[in-house]
Swiss-Prot record:
Keywords: Ribonucleoprotein, Ribosomal protein, RNA-binding, rRNA-binding. It comes from the Bacteria. This is Large ribosomal subunit protein uL2. The lineage of its organism: Bacteria, Pseudomonadati, Chlorobiota, Chlorobiia, Chlorobiales. Residues 222-279 are annotated as: Disordered. Belongs to the universal ribosomal protein uL2 family. Residues 232-242 have a biased composition (Gly residues).
Length: 279
């Protein structure tokens, strides 16, 4: 996928870039797989902001994605590659031989007309899904389950892939995109290949208005606030943090630079072989 740069006709378009839509083969989504999305603006039912910097944006429909890939033994044909406004990757519409239609994440290199399948003993091919115990070591995978049958939860964004590094007993060892090395049960499923649209990370929004189209509101620096609104607010002029002065903090007083916040008593802690920030 090539990135398309705009001519510097206006200040906003000077550095703006858009993804190329060459791989997209259909402009209208499958209506039977759409559900409406109710926008919250980051508010809970009491009307209070619980997620900051959210609001506005273009109206969207949610595409129901098959993260479980549990339709075993029934081959499917890739009918189209489509744009999904709710995620960074593209999605592929599958037509199964029994007539059912489902969306999946579109891996890199998947073409319209190709066959994909899921099951215990399927071919090692891009787009096929199977348990981790049947995938060869060194294979690039995505849409990985954390619990068998729950559906893929990690490695789902554009250009992401994990590497199957080792297999021992009831667990396999995965190297994740973050750098974390983690164990997962061999019964968990994953899809072969790398998630498509890898150039997404190089896109430049170019102007504030384009963030608003995406539903992202402006972010105010804590130092620019009053003391009542932020631990780093107030002071005469620019009262810097660090160097014996105030340490940077989150709006709720949590130390912001490098403090580990994960609970070490979590049961899944023993499954992390090496953390993502380990040297």
């Amino acid at each position: 996928m090539a990135i398309r740069k705009l001519a510097p006709v206006t200040p906003g378009s000077r550095f703006m870039s858009y993804p190329g839509f060459d791989e997209i083969t259909k402009s209208e989504p499958e209506k039977s797989l759409l559900v409406p999305v109710k926008r919250t603006g980051g508010r809970n039912r009491a009307g209070r902001i619980t997620s900051r910097h959210m609001g506005g944006g273009h109206k969207r429909h949610y595409r129901i994605i098959d993260f479980k890939r549990n339709k075993d033994g029934v081959p499917a044909t890739v009918a189209s590659i489509e744009y999904d406004p709710n995620r960074s990757s593209r999605i592929a519409l599958l037509h199964y031989n029994d007539g059912e239609k489902r969306y999946i994440l579109a891996p890199k290199g998947l073409k319209v007309g190709e066959k994909v399948e899921s099951g215990e003993k399927v071919e090692i091919k891009t787009g096929n899904t199977m348990p981790l115990k049947n995938i060869p070591l060194g294979t690039d995978i995505h849409n990985v389950e954390m619990r068998a049958g729950k559906g893929g939860q990690i490695v789902r964004s554009a250009g992401a892939f994990a590497v199957l590094a080792a297999r021992e007993g009831d667990y396999v060892t995965l190297k994740l995109p973050s750098g974390e090395i983690r164990k997962v049960r061999v019964e968990c499923r994953a899809t072969i290949g790398v998630v498509g649209n890898a150039e997404h990370e190089n896109i430049v929004l170019g102007k504030a208005g384009r963030s608003r189209w995406l539903g992202i509101r402006p972010q105010t620096r804590g130092m620019a606030m009053n003391p009542v609104d932020h631990p780093m607010g107030g002071g005469e002029g620019k009262s810097k943090s660090g160097g014996g002065r105030r340490h940077p903090k989150s709006p709720w007083g949590q130390l912001a630079k490098g403090l580990k916040t994960r609970n070490k008593k979590k049961a899944s802690q023993k499954l992390i072989v090496r953390g993502r920030n380990a040297k």
